[in-house]
Swiss-Prot record:
Protein name: Flagellar biosynthesis protein FlhA
PANTHER family associated with the record: FLAGELLAR BIOSYNTHESIS PROTEIN FLHA-RELATED, FLAGELLAR EXPORT PROTEIN, MEMBRANE FLHA SUBUNIT-RELATED
Task performed by this protein: Required for formation of the rod structure of the flagellar apparatus. Together with FliI and FliH, may constitute the export apparatus of flagellin.
Domain of life: Bacteria
Gene3D superfamilies with a match to the protein in the record: FHIPEP family, domain 1 (3.40.30.60), FHIPEP family, domain 3 (1.10.8.540), FHIPEP family, domain 4 (3.40.50.12790)
Tagged with keyword ATP-binding: no
Recorded GO CC terms: plasma membrane
């Protein structure tokens, strides 16, 4: 007995168990069994009672649900309950036809009760009641709910693109985070699936009502044939017995069907609020005392008409008038009015104390636009700038190896109407102008002729440009100008600024998130690396040094392997950066020179190189004249390199690379300083020009 109890014991935590997985298959098996196997009357009583209880539960859940998606399983439940009722009809029909001649209890006590007590044992009344229930279910509730579900599905599908764009806009504006955006997108998808399912599920109920009417006719006709032909019953006795059993069977199935249809109507007609259906009805029906008073007045007039049931009308008149008077007094009582006035005065005179919520943290990256540029960042007005910026962030992450911060875009009345500002931590790092509806014609250096328009400079690279009207677009292209839209101008400028400040935008939080991301892919390599082998601060500084010189950090495996090899003996971030750069020599060479076998670089004179090495080893600085001369010669070499179509790269001794890079970075940010150890094998190096110090 104890073993049996232990076998039958259900798990305590149903949600974490696998018992729920069996619910669907068990129910399907039960339905098929009822259709195929003959059931005893007692089991039919249990199943009919279970069907009624299930329908009441579904209706109550629909009533207490606050949002439609809180009962997203309703279409599936509707299908299962419909199949359950039909299978019960099949099982009860079988037992009525087989055992109906034995008496009214042949199909169980539940069918007998519905056939006798609820309709007084009169099969004519039972047929009328049954037909009325079917008409209510089929013509009123089901038809209305089906139409609402159809229209709701159409509107939900039509509104999906707008909802998705609104979610993307909120995400790009920083109003919500990525997790909230995923949650909202999932809800939009679930809502669409729900109303689409409800549109089809409503057909189940309509078909169930039609099937119930046909089963009634089949049972009556079949019962007469079986009773008279097989059991030699009198026609009147057969008609009375089988009709009452059929009516009981029909009523015990149609009443749950009516309840389920009502639940479907409640689900599709409700509006999502913080209240359930009952609270909405009570709050909105009985909150206005004038409505109750007017209703009481109309009922009172009807109650005074001769021949009317005066007591009933006057009773409800008094009840509604009393309720209206009570609500009116409650709304207009001195205490309530005084409380409202006090709250209003307190609200006006309240001194709001400063709190930590008033401290506004600066966004890592943001953009402010003038009011004429607002349509460009508004998805509802077909603005495409948000999508372009999202694409730039994704491309940057793929190329440089980390995801930059979300760009918070806002309008600012202090910014000129057609201007914009790009800010990093609240400080402007770029600005420009854009004119929606016009085109920017950029002169790449080989354009011929002039164009009518507003002369300006392209904000990203400072090239001469002209804002032109759409009518001059083709002419500008023919003359050799590069013509771009206003949104492209801003997007290109933003991309340039993003790459320019890649190192400063890479903070400790980004370093931690990147390390966590790598840890998921390479758990053995990253195990015990931080903080046992090196600190997060050192890793952050090394990666920041790489980004400061436009070196991508995509190859984190190579970076971490180099750090793991040298970090135990070396803790200086600058020295570790040099080691990592050598390990990344293939990526660095590929980044600056592509697949070219011959690479053209700017060289450093051997004499100047020895002089710089001696100065570095002795700790002394360079003479001002020599430093100025090196800077000027580097500038001339970069110009010649760019005019010849080459990449501005200075190749120096490995020991001098870091020093010269820091020295030349401010005046020549476009110049990349590489060491001879950072060039991958198999590349032929050709010096196009030489920086020779004072003797050049």
């Amino acid at each position: 007995m104890a073993n049996l109890a232990s076998l039958l014991r259900l798990p305590g935590n149903w949600k974490s168990s696998q018992w729920q997985i069996l619910a669907g298959p068990v129910l399907i098996l039960l339905i098929l069994s009822m259709m195929v196997l003959p059931l005893p009357p007692f089991l039919l009583d249990l199943l009919f009672t279970f069907n009624i209880a299930l329908s009441i539960m579904v209706l109550l859940v629909a009533m207490f649900t606050r949002r439609t998606l809180d009962f997203a399983a309703f279409p599936t439940i509707l299908l299962f309950t419909t199949l359950l009722r039909l299978s019960l009809n099949v099982a009860s029909t079988r037992i009525i036809l087989m055992e109906g001649h034995t008496g009214s209890a042949a199909a169980g006590r539940v069918v007998e009760a519905f056939g006798h007590f609820l309709v007084g044992g009169n099969f004519a009344i039972g047929i009328v009641v049954f037909i009325i229930l079917i008409l209510i279910n089929f013509m009123v509730i089901t038809k209305g709910a089906g139409r609402i579900a159809e229209v709701g599905a159409r509107f939900v599908l039509d509104g999906m693109p707008g909802k998705q764009m609104a979610i993307d806009a909120d995400l790009n504006a920083g109003i919500i985070n990525e997790e909230e955006a995923k949650k909202r997108r999932k809800e939009v998808s679930l809502e669409s699936d729900f109303y689409g399912s409800m549109d089809g599920a409503s057909k189940f109920v309509r078909g169930d009502a039609i099937a119930g009417l046909m089963i009634l006719v089949i049972n009556v006709v079949g019962g007469l044939v079986v009773g008279v032909a097989q059991h030699n019953m009198a026609l009147n006795d057969a008609a009375s017995t089988y009709t009452l059993l059929t009516i009981g069977d029909g009523l015990v199935a149609q009443i749950p069907a009516l309840i389920i249809s009502t639940a479907a109507g409640v689900i599709v007609t409700r509006v999502a609020t913080d209240e359930d259906v009952g609270q909405q009805m009570v709050t909105q029906l009985f909150d206005n005392p004038r409505v109750l008073m007017l209703t009481a007045g109309v009922l009172g007039l009807l109650g005074l008409v001769p021949g009317m049931p005066n007591f009933v009308f006057l009773f409800f008149t008094a009840a509604l008038a009393g309720l209206g008077w009570y609500i009116l007094k409650r709304h207009s009582s001195p205490q309530v009015q005084q409380q409202k006035e006090l709250e209003q005065v307190e609200k006006q005179n309240r001194v709001v104390e400063a709190s930590w919520e008033d401290v506004q943290l600066e966004d890592p990256l943001s953009m402010e636009v003038g009011y004429r540029l607002i349509p460009m960042v508004d998805n509802r007005q077909n603005g495409e700038l948000l999508g372009r910026i999202s694409g730039i962030r994704k491309k940057f992450a793929q190329e440089m190896g980390y995801l930059p911060p979300v760009v918070h875009i806002r309008d600012n009345m202090e910014v000129k109407p057609s201007s914009y500002r790009i800010l990093m931590k609240g400080v402007e790092i770029g600005h420009g102008e854009a004119h929606p509806g016009r085109w920017l014609a950029i002169n790449p250096g080989n354009a011929v002729g002039t164009l009518e328009g507003d002369n300006t400079q392209e904000p990203a690279f400072g090239l001469p440009a002209v804002w032109i009207d759409d009518s001059l677009r083709e002419q500008a292209q023919v003359q050799g100008y590069t013509v771009v839209a206003a949104s492209t101008v801003i997007a290109t400028h933003f991309n340039h600024v993003l790459n320019q400040y890649a190192a400063e935008l890479f903070g400790r939080q980004e370093a931690q998130m990147l390390f966590d991301r790598v840890s998921k892919e390479l758990p053995k390599m990253t195990e015990n690396m931080i903080p046992d082998m090196l600190s997060l601060t050192v890793l952050h500084k090394v990666l920041q040094n790489l980004l400061a010189e436009q070196v991508p950090i995509r190859d984190m495996r190579t970076i971490l392997e180099a750090l793991a090899e040298h970090a135990p003996e070396q803790k200086d971030p600058a020295e570790l950066t040099a080691v990592v750069r050598v390990a990344l020599r293939r990526a660095i060479t590929q980044h600056w020179f592509g697949d070219k076998e011959e690479i053209q670089v700017i060289g450093l004179d051997a004499g100047l190189e020895r002089l710089l090495l001696q100065a570095m080893q002795s700790g002394g600085g360079l003479e001002p004249g020599l430093a100025e001369n090196i800077e000027q010669q580097a500038l001339d070499a970069v110009r010649r390199q760019e005019m010849s179509g080459g990449v501005p790269v200075l190749l120096v001794n490995h020991a001098l690379r870091s020093l010269l890079s820091r020295f030349l970075r401010r005046s020549l940010p476009q110049l990349a300083v590489l060491s001879n150890m950072e060039i991958s094998e198999g590349r032929h190096i050709r010096m196009t020009s030489m920086i020779g110090g004072q003797n050049n």
